[in-house]
């Protein structure tokens, strides 16, 4: 039975189907007649395992008429590839660079009882590290677009509701770091944020909110 590409790429997406039928969907997309593709070289610098993300990204790009060629860093080698470079990445000459990091890549998170000054120093150290990544990439590949994830909230909050109040709370630290990422994006060309924080929240909120219940009974949650 042929795949219904229009249905597959109409929101809301069937995530299970996209994951299970990646190869079949890719073949069907490339077999479309009369489709002219724009070729793009995309480097994915990984802070975690990104194979499935890369594969699904390829499907959506192909559906949009973009045929990607990928460079993928080794696991958790995003910093080394960005700051020190390597010959394979240089030869690839990426047009788009995705720095795919998340909360697990924060190296020095606040700990219980850290003073305001210590927390600020930890924030500044993280920003210095990421700014170094962005500036090195921009200098080495000046025509490339850089896309950086911001940080989603940590799954566990050891301080409960105080996690967003105390300066050493992880939630407050992530919010501070995300604001700094946004400030950098607002003042630098060819640099864009991917709102991983918002995406994670929407996935969570989709399980929290029931629109039918609100429309029918005004239950807000």
Feature annotation, model-predicted:
Residues 2-36:
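Short N-terminal or domain-adjacent regulatory/targeting segments
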Residues 2-4, 30-39, 56-58, 63-73, ...:
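Alpha-helical cap/lid subdomain in secreted, periplasmic
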Residues 1, 10, 14-17, 45, ...:
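Non-membrane alpha-helical secondary structure
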Residues 39-55:
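Catalytic nucleophile-elbow at a beta strand-turn-alpha helix junction centered on a G-D-S/GDSL motif
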Residues 12-14, 76-79:
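Compositionally biased, intrinsically disordered low-complexity regions enriched in proline and serine
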């Amino acid at each position: 039975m042929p795949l219904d590409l229009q249905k597959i790429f109409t929101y809301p997406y069937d995530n299970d189907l996209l994951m299970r039928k990646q190869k079949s969907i890719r073949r069907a997309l490339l077999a479309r007649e009369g489709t002219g593709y724009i070729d793009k070289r995309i480097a994915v610098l990984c802070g975690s395992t990104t194979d499935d993300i890369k594969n699904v990204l390829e499907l959506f790009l192909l559906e949009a008429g973009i045929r990607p060629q990928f460079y993928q860093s080794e696991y958790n080698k995003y910093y080394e590839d960005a700051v020190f470079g390597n010959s394979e990445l240089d030869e690839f000459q990426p047009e788009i660079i995705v720095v795919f990091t998340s909360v697990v890549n924060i190296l020095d998170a606040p700990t219980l009882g850290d003073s305001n000054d210590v927390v600020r120093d930890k924030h500044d150290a993280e920003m210095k590290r990421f700014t170094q990544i962005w500036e090195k990439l921009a200098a080495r590949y000046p025509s490339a677009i850089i896309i950086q994830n911001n940080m989603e909230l940590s799954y566990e909050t050891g301080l409960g509701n105080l996690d967003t109040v105390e300066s050493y709370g992880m939630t407050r630290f992530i919010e501070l770091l995300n604001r700094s990422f946004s400030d950098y994006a607002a003042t630098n060309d060819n640099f864009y944020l991917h709102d991983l924080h918002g995406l994670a929240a929407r996935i969570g909120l989709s399980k929290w909110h029931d629109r039918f219940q609100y429309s029918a009974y005004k239950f807000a949650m």
